[in-house]
């Protein structure tokens, strides 16, 4: 196993950080890696907002539901779908009309590009010995976050990433069996997939039991049900439209 794959497969979310700052050279390398990642049509539909100001990080922590590691770690990156640059290129610099943000494709493209960027930043940071944890809860209060970071129209906050020096490395969390994720030639039949999920539920229950000293035995199915039994961010469409993503087509 080469060093790149070794680093990738050793990933774990870190929720406890020292107060040691992240060097600017390291941040520059992480962002350079992000910019080198692929994007749809080379449109580069991602903007990264780097936040290091303590008061601003504290506010983001509150908006994300009270996640102290955002406030504790020295760096927070916000990944945004960004069609503002495209709007400038098409309508301000040239005589074109931007239509893409009137359809769902713009949301899909922006989300995919932002996901690639976040994954790349995670891999780059961890290759430098830093710890990370992604923050999806930035979508919980998007209006306040948009105002706090002065995001213009056609820009939407999708996910965040905490970066810092780990104070404690948590145990590596088990993943679904590879057969459940990597299907050969055609999609796996439902019976086999169900069997893999059942086995994984047992593994996750054992992991949680050990991690919490017997206080919790919640499995994977129960964990995702706590989110997917409801529309936990029901205002997303409204906020997308307010930011210029009409999602009509």
Curated annotation (Swiss-Prot):
Reduces FMNH(2) to FMN, with NADH or NADPH as reductant. It also reduces nitroaromatic compounds, quinones, chromates and azo dyes. It could supply the reduced form of FMN to luciferase-like protein and contribute to the degradation of aromatic compounds. CDD domains: NfsA-like (cd02146). Homodimer. The keyword Oxidoreductase applies. It holds the Pfam family Nitroreductase. This is FMN reductase [NAD(P)H]. Its EC number is 1.5.1.39. Belongs to the flavin oxidoreductase frp family. GO terms for molecular function: FMN reductase (NADH) activity; FMN reductase (NADPH) activity; FMN reductase [NAD(P)H] activity. GO terms for biological process: catabolic process; response to toxic substance. The keyword Thylakoid does not apply. Keywords: Aromatic hydrocarbons catabolism, Detoxification, Flavoprotein, FMN, NAD, Oxidoreductase. FMN is a competitive inhibitor of NADH, and therefore leads to the preferential utilization of NADPH. Catalysis proceeds by a classical ping-pong bi-bi reaction mechanism. The reduction of nitro-organic compounds and inorganic chromate occur in the absence of external FMN and are therefore believed to require binding of these substrates in the active site. In contrast to these reduction processes, azo dyes are reduced only in the presence of external FMN, indicating that azo dye reduction occurs outside the active site of the enzyme. It catalyses: FMNH2 + NADP(+) = FMN + NADPH + 2 H(+); FMNH2 + NAD(+) = FMN + NADH + 2 H(+).
